Amino acid sequence: MSHNAMEHWKSKLSKTSTSTYVLLAVIAVVFLVTIRRPNGSKGKSSKKRASKKNKKGKNQFEKAPVPLTLEEQIDNVSLRYGNELEGRSKDLINRFDVEDEKDIYERNYCNEMLLKLLIELDSIDLINVDESLRRPLKEKRKGVIKEIQAMLKSLDSLK
C-alpha cells in the first residue's frame, strides 16, 4: 500500500464513530455464536448428547462392578508386584549404573510404584473382620509387605 492510501484509511477510521465499532463487534459475536451452534439447536443439544452417551453406556455395562474381597485385594497387589515390578526391579539392580540417568529414573519409578503398592496394602482394613479370617489375611498381607519392603531396601542401596 502506498503512503497516500494509508493516510486515506487513517482519516476514514478517525471519522468513524464508536457506535459503528460496537455494532461491528456485536455482528461479529453473533456470527461466531451462530457458526459454533449446530443447526436448529436451542442450547439443548449438549443435554441430548449426554443422555445418548448415558444410554450407550448403560447398554454396554449394565451391571456395576463387584467389589473385591479383602483376600482378592491382597492377591491383586501381590500379582501386580510379581508381574510388573519384581522382575523390573531385579533387572535394574543387576545392571544399575550410577552415571546413567535412565537407570536413576527407572530406580525412582520402581521406588514410587512399590511405595504405592504398600499404601494400597495399608488401606486394606481388617479391623471389622472376624478373628478366624483376620489372622490369615494379616499374615498374607504381612508377607507381601515384607517382599515389597525388601525390594525397596535393595533399590535404596543403589544410591
Curated annotation (Swiss-Prot):
- Compartments it resides in: Endoplasmic reticulum membrane; Nucleus membrane
Q: Any additional notes?
A: Present with 3346 molecules/cell in log phase SD medium.
Q: What does this protein do?
A: Stimulator of ATPase activity of molecular chaperones of the HSP70 family (principally of the SSA class). Stimulation is important for HSP70-substrate complex dissociation after folding of newly synthesized or refolded proteins. SNL1 is probably involved in nuclear pore biogenesis and in particular the folding or refolding of misfolded NUP116, GLE2 and NIC96.
Q: What is this protein called?
A: HSP70 co-chaperone SNL1
Q: Which residues form a coiled coil?
A: none
**Which source organism?**
Saccharomyces cerevisiae (strain ATCC 204508 / S288c)
| Topological domains annotated Cytoplasmic | 36-159
SUBUNIT field: Interacts with the HSP70 family members SSA1, SSA4, and SSB1. These interactions are strongly reduced by ADP and ATP.
Q: Where is the composition biased (Basic residues)?
A: 44-58
